[in-house]
Regions:
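Short, charged surface segments at domain edges that flank catalytic/cofactor-binding sites
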Residues: 67-127, 158
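Mixed-charge, low-complexity interaction segments
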Residues: 1-83
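Residue-level signal for secondary-structure boundary elements
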Residues: 28, 49, 94, 178, ...
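DEDD superfamily 3′-5′ metal-dependent exonuclease/proofreading module
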Residues: 99-101, 116, 133, 200, ...
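A detector for short metal-coordination/catalytic motifs
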Residues: 111-113, 149-150, 160-205
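Histidine-centered nuclease catalytic patch
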Residues: 121-168, 177
Length: 205
């Protein structure tokens, strides 16, 4: 492996380490775990069993590895979920983070607080409240894309999906702002009412 590829591998491994530390603060991930997650869930090498064999893991199969390391299975699923969000944006828009999942993951990690709980960039509602509101039927939508997941918002709707133009936003804020209102005007004129709405929802949870 040439030096530039090795440096990128180290950078990606450190990025995954930082994200998992925030999302799974009580879990322990070995270097082998991190190597596996980088190659399988980020680099998208096709065979988990081949990766495990090449990195010197003594467990023979992917499922046995997950059985012995449940935190790795959870982390793998989490990283694949993030990749799914990236892939969906790529289908719908051009030039999403310059086509780099690693750049997207770096942005995702940057926007994930130390406690692992993300918030809407406008009204501040946390993703746990958002998920609970949908789960309990307090917020309902017929549109599948309107869910308890935080959406990826472009502050400037005419700009690209990139690290300095994207934030997480709740479905209420993202839908209300659309592409007609500037972030500044939306924050000034609409956000106070949306904050009151979420406080009303929290009282019912």
């Amino acid at each position: 492996m040439d030096e530039s590829k090795e440096n990128r591998k180290i950078e990606t491994k450190e990025l995954v380490r930082q994200y998992l530390k925030r999302k799974y603060p009580d879990a322990q991930f070995s270097d082998i775990d991190l190597d596996f997650l980088v190659r399988y869930s980020v680099k998208k090498e096709p065979s988990a069993n081949t990766i495990l064999k090449s990195i010197g893991n003594d467990i023979q199969t992917e499922q046995a590895y997950y059985n012995a390391h449940p935190a790795v299975k959870a982390a793998k699923d989490d990283l694949q979920y993030i990749y799914g969000r990236f892939s969906q944006k790529q289908k719908d828009y051009k030039n999403v983070f310059n086509g780099s999942f690693e750049a997207f993951l770096a942005w995702w990690c940057e926007k994930t607080p130390e406690n692992g709980i993300r918030h809407c960039c406008y009204c501040g509602v946390d993703e746990n409240t958002l998920k609970d509101a949908f789960k309990n039927g307090l917020v309902i939508s017929k549109k599948p894309s309107f869910s308890g997941e935080l959406q990826i918002e472009r502050k400037d709707p005419d700009g690209d999906y990139c690290d300095n133009n994207c934030e997480f936003a709740c479905v209420i804020c993202n839908n209300a702002k659309s592409d007609m209102i500037s972030a500044e005007d939306f924050t000034k004129f609409f956000v106070p009412g949306i904050k009151e709405y979420w406080e009303h929802i929290k009282e019912k949870l």
